[in-house]
Amino acid sequence: MKLLAIISASLALAGFTTATPPPQTFSIKAKGNPKVPSARFDASRSNIFLNYGDSGAVCEVKPGCPKPKDAVFYLKDSILYLYTGSSNPVQKVFLDRSGFGQGKIGYLTGDGQLPSRWEVQGWTIDGAGNLKFKGKGLIACPTSDPKIKSWTVWADLGIATPGGNKGCLPFTAHTMKTKPVACKYT
């Protein structure tokens, strides 16, 4: 009994701490609409895209290993985060369902104050592995530049042309477990 107390006290004095395991990370793919290609989610320039290409993210990968092609996310307390690891500032996904934002989805770096109309809490993954915001799905809108083949991601609020975008289509945002590779997104 005394030996156990001595060991416990020694560990406490030595600053022994247990490492926090990384959160369950996942990538997201667009599925369920034949007009929206089975596309990966990318994060760049504070926006969420489908098939954006090189996002410019700086990732912590082992030498000889490629950086992830998809953005890496995790969910905590119904807030959707980009996985940045412990050495980068937090990056959390927001949604603006106001008349001004019309379902705009993006992400912010840091833990600063959010504008009052932006929401971060309300994300869930259903039993089939599909990501939703307060029970609603997502839509994709093709970019207006014909040279760019990516799509912007919006919340499905029943608005056919959010932000003035045309050709927007609903899809299922399906999550898939992935390795926790820390990246800082631009």
From Swiss-Prot:
The UniProt entry lists the main location of this chain as: secreted
Description of what induces expression: Expression is down-regulated in presence of human keratinocytes.
What are the boundaries of the signal sequence? 1-19
UniProtKB keywords = Allergen, Cell wall, Secreted, Signal, Sporulation
A GO biological process this protein is involved in? Answer: sporulation resulting in formation of a cellular spore
Q: Listed disulfide bonds for this chain?
A: none
- Name its cellular compartments: Secreted; Secreted, Cell wall
A GO CC annotation recorded here is: extracellular region
Q: Which family does it belong to?
A: Belongs to the phiA family.
According to its UniProt entry, the function of this protein is described as:
Cell wall protein involved in development of asexual structures such as phialide and conidium development, and thus required for spore formation. Plays a role as a general stress protectant produced by the fungus in competition with antagonistic bacteria.
Protein known as: Cell wall protein phiA
- What's the source species for this entry? Arthroderma benhamiae (strain ATCC MYA-4681 / CBS 112371) (Trichophyton mentagrophytes)
Q: What is the lineage of its organism?
A: Eukaryota, Fungi, Dikarya, Ascomycota, Pezizomycotina
